[in-house]
Amino acid sequence: AVRSVNTPAAPGVGHQFAYLPDVAHTMAELLDRRDTLPAFASFHMAGHWDATGCALAEAVQRAVVRRGGAAPAIQPFPWWLVRLASPFVTTFRELLGMRYLWQQPARLDNRRLVQQLGHEPHTPLDEAVEATLVGLGCLSQTATPATWTGREARS
């Protein structure tokens, strides 16, 4: 069961992210056109823009509630713990090096991608979050608000 969601962003700092199936679909479409693209062409996706740094966590809350669960608490990510353990855990040290991405907004421009493809594959946020939670085993694939019993969270 999803009981809490940790948000790494500083309060009020926007963040951009993409749903991996949308990224895969975009890459496949670009590969289909590779013969017409310049060498080393680069494209950016707009993905989902979270202006407040909380939209993703709030989407997780909505998905859990839609499936009959209690809304998980939204909590700040424990950066202090990452800093404390970073001398001993390489991954944490590397994570600290990326923290700046959560402390200032950064937004990519997808105009070149849209010019090339005519669109950007984009799954609605709530649909993407719910599918991700199901895929990760955080939500039951079959549970719905009408059928959710709580047993799904323990299986």
What is each PLM-predicted segment?
Residues 102-104, 124-134:
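Short linear loop/turn motifs
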Residues 15-21, 51, 108, 123:
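Residue-level signal for the nucleotide or nucleotide-sugar donor/cofactor binding architecture
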Residues 20, 42, 82-120:
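Conserved C-terminal active-site "lid" loop/helix of NAD(P)H-dependent oxidoreductases
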Residues 26-95, 130-133, 139-155:
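Mid/C-terminal beta-alpha module of Rossmann-like enzyme folds, strongest
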Residues 11-14, 44, 48, 101, ...:
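Conserved short-loop catalytic and cofactor-binding motifs
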